[in-house]
Regions:
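Catalytic core of pol beta-like nucleotidyltransferases
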Residues: 1-35, 40-47, 56-112
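Structural signature of the urease/amidohydrolase superfamily beta/alpha-barrel
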Residues: 51-52
Length: 112
């Protein structure tokens, strides 16, 4: 039996992102998906989470963002994303994407 440790979990971050990407495409086909933060900068620690940036054509209100977040995670669970996967979703507009590009490295999901 495999012992699930924080390091073991983080070593599998790419597989979690692939599952999550599939879930995002099922829920919002027009979304652009990127990895940001520690994973994008190759500086994960055992306390890291995997930051996934979901870019939509326009800004959503708070309520719609929360609903979309839940819908994506439900779809990801159906696709067997482990419940312990340390995923953090950031749902932003194309305009907000520009700010991310100015301040940090972002990697398109298809380059993972």
């Amino acid at each position: 039996m495999v012992r699930v440790t924080p390091l073991w979990i983080l070593m599998r971050w790419r597989s979690y992102v692939r599952i999550l990407s599939e879930a995002i495409r099922a829920v919002i086909p027009e979304a652009e998906v990127y990895v940001v933060g520690g994973a994008a900068n190759d500086r994960l620690t055992v306390k890291s989470d995997i930051d996934v940036l979901i870019v939509l054509p326009h800004k959503l209100g708070f309520s719609k963002t929360v609903d979309l977040h839940a819908e994506i995670l439900e779809e990801a669970e159906k696709l067997k994303l482990p419940l312990y996967a340390p995923i953090e979703l950031h749902i932003v507009s194309k305009e907000e994407l520009k700010k991310y590009k100015q301040r940090e490295k972002i990697i398109p999901i298809n380059e993972i």
